[in-house]
Swiss-Prot record:
This is Elongation factor G. GO terms for molecular function: GTP binding; GTPase activity; translation elongation factor activity. GO terms for biological process: ribosome disassembly. The keyword Thylakoid does not apply. Residues 8-283 form the tr-type G domain. Pfam families: EF-G_D2, EFG_C, EFG_III, EFG_IV, GTP_EFTU. Coiled coil: none annotated. InterPro entries: EF-G-like_DII (IPR053905), EFG_II (IPR041095), EFG_III (IPR009022), EFG_III/V (IPR035647), EFG_IV (IPR047872), EFG_V (IPR035649), EFG_V-like (IPR000640), G_TR_CS (IPR031157).
Length: 691
């Protein structure tokens, strides 16, 4: 099938920012001006096109990254609207992985906010070129130049202003185009559809000349031929400036900065112009390199062409109430069409594509064919998960998957009624398949189901979705820490189990010695000699001991790191049995532990906190208050990375606490490191709570 839009006229972009910077409103205006939406949806009315889940419309925030397609000036633009809340980092992560460029939206009052820094770092990691849009210029306290300075200082970027605001706050009425030397004013009556071009206001002429000079210098520095021309005093043409800034933007040496107010319909069309002028097409970015699954050392370059064999990445799964499973798919080479069979190299299974959809938020359009560089939704895949590679069977290739962050918070969840139990299990498994940063696991010791995610809001939304989509009522509690028990000194037990109650009795007798076995788990040594216990009964003693160790004598937690030596015993020719020796073994280990000074152990987490220097003292003090032991510190571009070991029991609620202490500017990750003795006072409380 032939293309309607050539690849060089395609843009795959994300709209990213801190929560409340106005990303979704900006996207709404883009859809309005490109003719997709005939009525503007407002986020604060809960009528936004892109925020299509009920929870999003209620909370006025974007949770899942909705994908939509629009056209501007002969270009096709695929837009992914991403959430700005730190709990939904995975949505941003998986969007950036498949995008070619991004629009970073900033609040003109707040400037560079914490999540802006996080998202910017993610975009750096994936090498995504950006343009910046300083939004909300009509707000009280809006300051365009302060925002530009923050982009330079906090994000370590090299911003180049392509526009200047005309007025600010209530008096914000338009923008100056520094490249073409004109003012642009947006007609209120037509909701900004009509744009009036005019001369530069006299009071801004001096500032315009100064900033235009800065812009031309920044552009010329990126190109030797232009620099020579500029230094000779020759005026650079608009085409030369645009070409130069485009090249530097794609190579991530410059970041063009524009301004406006999406809510007031000011500056959105020039932003669209900037998207097609400065952000890359799929042909302008480095070609995707994968590996041969049958020979991992062999690299395979997936050239962006419809004529190449198919290779692409499933970057998101979603459930549609009318269609079922949707798999969002970025095509890096080749093409897909409905009815086609593809190879999933991650699962090593073949899959048939049912339908192909172009998405517009939660509306959809059936298409028959999609080519290299496109983003589409596939229907009918049964095996695919987020991060899977789909390709042509004749050229198997595996692409780099997504970087899935480890969950940082977990809570216990249980169905309110027995009838909810099966539905809870189904719902949790479905949600975990859609969202790889959400995990479900059973705790065998407590019998609880634990759900883990990126933060409290993340898990709140999950519980909310269980109720709305799966009709499951669930109670959510505080999880229990998985403590362990062990011994600190050797002990001995001589235990006889004898039972006579008419007929055949029960008889088992064993003598065991136990000692601490740090770091080596459970070890069983059989030192019986001379047949005092027949060898067929030895495994029963071992099994009885191991089963008894599943529930320790202090608080019923599993016992670890213990060495057991079976040294002596006796048996009865008639009454002895495997069952009798099983019971004798379990009784002996309990008795021996009482004599071996048992203690509680708790999980210690390896925690890394990255915080701006301003909050270092506060963060350190808080970690010390949580019984944390700081292991190391290192400077990281305007921030400090603290490595500490902290008991898991002290880490509940830490995500929220850290966010409030640092205005959300610090991030942390943690993973299990080892078990350590619980201080006596705390152990006493834990034991008391279990009795």
């Amino acid at each position: 099938m032939s293309r309607t839009v050539p690849i060089e006229k395609q843009r795959n972009i994300g709209i990213m920012a801190h929560i409340d910077a106005g990303k979704t409103t900006t996207t709404e205006r883009i859809l309005y001006y490109t003719g997709v939406s005939h009525k503007i949806g407002e986020t604060h009315d809960g009528a936004s096109t892109m925020d299509w889940m009920e929870q999003e419309q209620e909370r006025g925030i974007t949770i899942t990254s909705a994908a939509t397609t629009c056209f501007w000036d002969g270009y096709r633009i695929n837009i992914i609207d991403t959430p700005g809340h730190v709990d939904f980092t995975i949505e941003v992560e998986r969007s950036l992985r498949v995008l070619d460029g991004a629009v970073a939206v900033f609040d003109a009052v707040a400037g560079v906010e914490p999540q802006s820094e996080t998202v910017w770092r993610q975009a750096n990691r994936y090498g995504v070129p950006r343009v910046c849009f300083v939004n909300k210029m009509d707000r009280i306290g809006a300051n365009f130049f302060r925002c530009v300075d923050m982009i330079q200082e906090r994000l370590r970027a090299k911003p180049v202003c392509l526009q200047l605001p005309i007025g600010a706050e209530d008096n914000f009425e338009g923008i100056i185009d520094l490249i073409h030397g004109v003012s642009l004013k947006f007609d209120k009556e037509t909701k900004g559809l009509e744009v009036e071009r005019g001369p530069i206001p006299p009071e801004l002429m001096e500032l315009y000349q100064e900033k235009r000079l800065e812009m031309m210098e920044a552009a010329a520095e990126e190109d030797e031929v232009l620099l020579a021309k500029y230094l000779e005093g020759t005026e650079l043409t608009a085409e030369e400036i645009i070409a130069c800034i485009r090249k530097a933007t794609i190579e991530q040496r410059l970041v063009p900065v524009l301004c406006g107010s999406a809510f007031r319909n000011i500056g959105v069309q020039p932003l669209l112009d900037a998207v097609v002028q400065y952000l890359p097409s799929p042909l302008d970015i480095p070609q995707m390199v994968g590996h041969n699954p049958n020979s991992p050392e062999e690299e395979i370059v997936c050239h962006c062409s419809d004529k190449e064999p198919l290779a692409g990445l499933v970057f998101k799964l979603a459930s549609d109430p009318f269609i079922g499973h949707l798999s969002f798919f970025r095509i890096y080479s080749g093409f897909v069409e409905s009815g086609m069979t593809v190879l999933n190299t991650t699962t090593e299974k073949r899959e048939r594509i049912g339908r192909l959809l172009k998405m517009h938020a939660n509306k959809r359009e059936d298409i028959k064919w999609a080519g290299a560089g496109d983003i589409v939704a596939l229907v009918g895949l049964k095996q695919a998960s987020t991060g899977d590679t789909l390709c042509d069977e004749k050229r198997p290739v595996i692409l780099e998957s997504l970087d899935i962050p480890e969950p940082v918070i977990e809570v216990a969840i249980e169905p309110k009624t027995k009838t909810d139990r099966d539905a809870l299990s189904t719902g949790l498994n479905k949600l975990a398949k859609e969202d790889p940063s959400f995990r479900v696991k059973g705790n065998e010791e407590t019998g609880q189901t634990l759900i883990a995610g990126m933060g409290e809001l993340h898990l709140e939304i999950i519980v909310d979705r269980l109720l709305r989509e799966f009709n499951v009522n669930a109670n959510v509690g505080k999880p229990q820490v998985a403590y362990r028990e062990t011994i600190t000194k050797p002990g001995k037990s001589d235990t006889k189990y004898a039972k006579q109650s008419g007929g055949r009795g029960q008889y088992g007798h064993c003598v065991i010695e136990i000692e601490p076995n740090p770091g080596n788990g459970y070890t069983f040594i059989n030192s019986i000699s001379g047949g005092v216990i027949p060898k067929e009964y030895i495994p029963a003693i071992d099994k009885g001991i191991q089963d008894a160790l599943k529930s320790g004598i202090l608080a019923g937690f599993p016992v670890v790191d213990i060495k057991v030596n079976l040294v002596f015993g006796s048996y009865h020719e008639v009454d002895s049995s495997e069952q009798a020796f099983y019971v004798a073994g379990s009784m002996a280990i309990k008795d021996a532990m009482h004599k071996s000074n048992p203690i509680l152990l708790e999980p210690i987490m390896d925690v890394e906190v990255v915080t701006p220097d301003d909050y270092l003292g506060d963060v350190m003090g808080d970690l010390n208050g949580r019984r944390g032991k700081v292991q190391s510190m290192e400077a990281r571009s305007g921030a400090q990375a603290i490595r500490a070991q902290v008991p898991l029991s002290e880490m509940f609620g830490y995500a929220t606490e850290l966010r409030s202490r640092t205005q959300g500017r610090a991030t942390f990750s943690m993973q299990f490191d080892h078990y350590e003795r619980v201080p006596a006072a705390i152990a006493e409380e834990v034991i008391k709570s279990r009795s």
